[in-house]
Amino acid sequence: RTITPRIKDMLPDFSEDAIADSFFENVSDITIVACGTAMYAGMVGKTMIQNRLHIPVTVAIASEFRYEEPVINEKSMVIVVSQSGETIDTLEALRLANKYTKKTLSIVNVKGSSIARESSYVLYTHAGPEIAVASTKAYTVQVASFYLLACKLAMTQQKISVEEARTFVG
């Protein structure tokens, strides 16, 4: 449920998430904020996005980000990742990011969570409850979400063609 509903005509499509294409335009840099396993998914996401867009992408530990003066502006996109959507450090980092940019996107599993409510847009991963200590299910769907985001961003910013995007998704 993470990937299939977000692919139309072999292209990434976030219309079911109510995310307009304009959200992906004019992005100067991206900061990914998370804790724990979600941060490791963010590191993979950084590589995917940076390799496609050739713009600065940083990964920040939420517990540190919230105490720093963030280097973000209105053209910055901040992607916040949390399995539960309630991680307090990540939520506080999101609140700080919202003071600087309207381009905040959360990747969360739990519908209606605090992080989802306070983000400009949200991608629900639909992973279901995580039973094990090792968060493999959540990690996998977070990485899949980054894969689609990297493709959508690159296509919207004309870094790859529609045909390249289809190859990327296919």
What is the predicted function of each stretch?
Residues 1-9:
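Flexible catalytic loop/linker elements that gate and position reactive groups at enzyme active sites
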Residues 8-26:
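A short, well-structured juxtamembrane/interface segment
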Residues 25-168:
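Glycine-rich phosphate-binding loops that contact phosphosugars or nucleotide phosphates
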Residues 6, 19-22, 164-170:
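Exposed alpha-helical structural elements
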Residues 4, 16-17, 87, 91:
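Short, well-ordered alpha-helical scaffold segments within catalytic/effector domains
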